[in-house]
Amino acid sequence: MNPQLLRVTNRIIERSRETRSAYLARIEQAKTSTVHRSQLACGNLAHGFAACQPEDKASLKSMLRNNIAIITSYNDMLSAHQPYEHYPEIIRKALHEANAVGQVAGGVPAMCDGVTQGQDGMELSLLSREVIAMSAAVGLSHNMFDGALFLGVCDKIVPGLTMAALSFGHLPAVFVPSGPMASGLPNKEKVRIRQLYAEGKVDRMALLESEAASYHAPGTCTFYGTANTNQMVVEFMGMQLPGSSFVHPDSPLRDALTAAAARQVTRMTGNGNEWMPIGKMIDEKVVVNGIVALLATGGSTNHTMHLVAMARAAGIQINWDDFSDLSDVVPLMARLYPNGPADINHFQAAGGVPVLVRELLKAGLLHEDVNTVAGFGLSRYTLEPWLNNGELDWREGAEKSLDSNVIASFEQPFSHHGGTKVLSGNLGRAVMKTSAVPVENQVIEAPAVVFESQHDVMPAFEAGLLDRDCVVVVRHQGPKANGMPELHKLMPPLGVLLDRCFKIALVTDGRLSGASGKVPSAIHVTPEAYDGGLLAKVRDGDIIRVNGQTGELTLLVDEAELAAREPHIPDLSASRVGTGRELFSALREKLSGAEQGATCITF
C-alpha cells in the first residue's frame, strides 16, 4: 500500500474514532429497537400494503419475504432521470422472482442544474441535497422495509440519497444508475459555439442548435461533470454493481443490471445470506477510495463538499487536507471533457472503471479489503458485465487501457498530481480543478475586479472592462449568502479573455459546474464573504496571487490596511424571495462552510 494513502486513512480513522463509534452504536440500536413491520399494529400494516397486489399482500402478511423500498428520483426534467420511469416495473419483476416484494416508498426532487444555470432556481440547487436526504428519509420511515434501492444519478441527488441511506444505516442498500446518453456534438465544438455567442459572432438559434445537439437524449450528459463523477465515485465505493455506471439506458444490459441490483439487495438483508447494512459497508477505507476515484479522474469539485457531507452521515470526519495530501500521490489517469476532448462513452470504450480500478489497486492506491454491494473485496470491480446468451454475467475487464489518450497507465499518467488542488492563504481556503487548466495558466498575480453578482460580469465583459490581466472576484455566492449557486455561465466570457492572451483567474465563494474548464478558478472560498471572510474586504485594483501549483491564494494588501477596512456586505434580501427561495431561508441560514460540506444537517 502507498504509505501516504495509509497515513491519510489512519488519521481519518483516528479523527473519526468517537463519531464513527457513536454512529455504529446508533445503527446497531436501530437494528434491534426499530419497529419492524412484523411488530406494526394491524392497522399500520394494513395501510402499508393496502395498494399492493393480492400476491404481495399475502407475502407481506406472512412476514417470510423481504420487502424492498424503492426510493426514486424520476422526473422528465432531467435527461438522466427520465429512464427511471419504468425501473419500478423491472425491479418488482426481479424481486418477485427472488421471492421478495418491492414498493415505491417515496420520490425525491431532482433538479437539473443545466436548466437552472444562471437562473434564480440555481440558488436552490445545493439546498436541494438536504431536501433530497430528508425526503428519502420520509419514505423509509414507514418501517416496512428490509432493504432499499436508490434510483438517482445527478448532481445533488446521489449525495442526498447517500445521506438518507446512511441515516437508515441498519438497512442494506444498493444504488441503481441509469447510464449516459449516446455521444452528441463534440464538447470542444460546443464550447467553441458558446464562446462565439459570447463575442456576438453567432446568433441565439445557432447556440440553441449546438446545445440541443449536445444534450439530445435520455441519460446523463456525456461530459465529466458532477453527475458522471457521482457514478464514478459510488462505483469505486462499492455502492452499485461492478461496471454498471456507464451502460446506456434502454439497453438489454442496462435492464439486466437493474434486475440484478434488485436481486442482490435481497441477499444483503437480514433474511439473506450476505447481510451487509450500508452503515457498516461504508467505512473510512471506502471513503478514501471515493476520494481517490475523484482525484484520479479529475472529477467535479462539487465532491470536495459532497464527500465531506456523505462521510459525516456515516460518522466519518474528512477535510480538504485529506484531499490535498492524497492528491500529492494519486496521479491523474483519465482525460475526459473538460479535462480533454473525450466524453464518458469514450471512457467506457477505453476500458472504463475496471481498468482504472485494476491500475490503482496494482499501485497500492486503493483499499482492496473493503465490503461492497457485490461482496468483499474491491477486486470484484475489475470485472465487467456482459450478456452471455441473454443472461447477465461478469468477466475480467481489460488488462490495460484500450485508448491511452483517454485512460492512462499509472506509470505514464497525464499528470503525477491528482486533478484537484487545495489553495490557502489570507483569503481563506479554496479548491481548484487543475486537471482542466493548462500548467501555464495555473499561476496568476493581477489586479482584482470585484463583482457582487454573476450577472454583472457579462455586461463588464461586453463593455471591454475585462480586456486586461485581472482576477475576477465574484463574492457573496457562498452557502449562507444565497445557497452557493454554480457560476458556470461565467466560463464562456472568461474563456474568451484567455484566448485573447490575457492572464485571467476567477476567485469566488460560489461553486462551478463539474464541467468547469480552462479558466483557473479558486472556488468554494471559505470562510465566505457573507460569514466573515476576508473576501468581503477585497477592493477593485487589489493584487491577488492565485497559484494552482503551490496552492496559494493571497490578497497582497498590507495587514494594517486590511484591518482598517470595513467588509462590504450588500443587501441580499431581494435574492431571497421568488422562485421558492423564501421557503429555504431556514435551511440556508444553518448551512456550514464549504469545507464542512455546506450542510445544515447535523450528524
Curated annotation (Swiss-Prot):
GO terms for molecular function: 4 iron, 4 sulfur cluster binding; metal ion binding; phosphogluconate dehydratase activity. Binds 1 [4Fe-4S] cluster. PROSITE patterns: ILVD_EDD_1, ILVD_EDD_2. [4Fe-4S] cluster binds at residues 154, 221. It comes from Escherichia coli (strain K12). One of its GO terms (biological process) is D-gluconate metabolic process. Gene3D superfamilies: IlvD/EDD C-terminal domain-like. HAMAP family: Edd. Sensitive to oxidants such as superoxide or hydrogen peroxide. It catalyses: 6-phospho-D-gluconate = 2-dehydro-3-deoxy-6-phospho-D-gluconate + H2O. It comes from the Bacteria. Signal peptide: none annotated. Keywords: 4Fe-4S, Carbohydrate metabolism, Gluconate utilization, Iron, Iron-sulfur, Lyase, Metal-binding. This is Phosphogluconate dehydratase. GO terms for cellular component: cytosol. The keyword Iron-sulfur applies. The lineage of its organism: Bacteria, Pseudomonadati, Pseudomonadota, Gammaproteobacteria, Enterobacterales.
